Amino acid sequence: SVGFKAGVKDYRLTYYTPDYQTKDTDILAAFRVTPQPGVPPEEAGAAVAAESSTGTWTTVWTDGLTSLDRYKGRCYGIEPVAGEESQFIAYVAYPLDLFEEGSVTNMFTSIVGNVFGFKALRALRLEDLRIPVAYVKTFQGPXHGIQVERDKLNKYGRPLLGCTIKPKLGLSAKNYGRAVYECLRGGLDFTKDDENVNSQPFMRWRDRFVSXAEALYKAQAETGEIKGHYLNATAGTCEEMMKRAVFARELGVPIVMHDYLTGGFTANTTLAHYCRDNGLLLHIHRAMHAVIDRQKNHGMTFRVLAKGLRMSGGDHIHSGTVVGKLEGERDITLGFVDLLRDDFIEKDRSRGIYFTQDWVSLPGVLPVASGGIHVXHMPALTEIFGDDSVLQFGGGTLGHPWGNRPGAVANRVALEACVQARNEGRDLAREGNEIIREAAKWSPELAAACEVWKEIKFEFAAMDVL
């Protein structure tokens, strides 16, 4: 007969390869697959590998013009998920050649771009990625990283303190600057634009940048400490975003900010390169992440979004609190906190880490804990996150009964007390309340803060459990 072997073949005949030995250069992915009834797991896993690499639904003539063996994704392992009847973890290996160098955008378009709407699957979740060293090396990564940031700020041996300025929408630039000044003057290291403060009618971006810079220079002069305010450069176009970043640099401020998921990885990587070239730190907010990562069976985990951010570039990223008002299961959160900060992270399924990841000295990212936290959480936060973190109290600073500056004082006193106690060998988990109470005896600001928030709890079970 003429022609080639046309027709529809099972994916597993080509894309399920249980004997495949993964290469050091492969990008490896772990997917949580929930097939439709009647679809065998091998076929579902192979379908994921095919549709996210070289495959399509039928054999095509042009397959003969290339080497599938060289370019195809391969499903090389399938394991059942404990306690879930029809759910599997499918491991897929992708050859490095499938990806454009230095493009997080292309990596995600390839791996998660198309396959999540696939009919043979009820649901699909990307649990983890192993980024090979060869691919990591094509990325600049964070603009500066943890060590350089500490050197720039001259702050060592403790977590950094921040505060999001509230009410997040509606303040004029002048009043916004007043709020920034009071917080920094009271003892915080940073204040922050909210993620949705961009350039609205009540406060245009340029006025805000000028007011905040004035506030931080005044606070810096009075305290002798280096201060920062995260100026949110996120905008409707990349050109506008860069214009804002350039103006921030002209003001001489130390740090700008970007919403990396709503702004997109392409814009984020552009900004990160500019920040490294011009000595600006880059704070990253993860607005929209829960749309993608909160469902247990579908979407992708935050650890994947966090890896993508470390490659694209950012010096800080919000990462949940474990104790406040927003999602964050302790082991899972600590798993991706290590993926952000450390150079080498061992596979550890108990923390949701499916692969050993070597970052080959790509700079680390400081995790930012924020959302419903206050002074009474300080011992737990210091214990959980350690020194390399930013603890951000929005309402937990500005909600102080005496105002912003006393709120900032209370937080700084609580933090210094916890760090000192830890350095003296005390157990923060057990003696935390006692440590805060002792400090409150000589700090009226802290005593007042403890009084206001002594009863507040955000007690709900976490959604994302292993």
Swiss-Prot record:
CDD domains found in the cross-reference section: RuBisCO_large_I
Cofactor(s) needed for function: Mg(2+)
Any one Gene Ontology molecular-function term assigned to this protein's record: monooxygenase activity
Residues found modified as N6,N6,N6-trimethyllysine: 5
Location(s) in or outside the cell: Plastid, Chloroplast
Note on cofactor: Binds 1 Mg(2+) ion per subunit.
Record-linked Gene3D superfamilies: Ribulose bisphosphate carboxylase, large subunit, C-terminal domain (3.20.20.110), RuBisCO large subunit, N-terminal domain (3.30.70.150)
Keyword Zinc annotated: no
Binding site for substrate: 114, 164, 168, 286, 318, 370
Family listed: Belongs to the RuBisCO large chain family. Type I subfamily.
Name the record gives this protein: Ribulose bisphosphate carboxylase large chain
Organism: Hedera helix (English ivy)
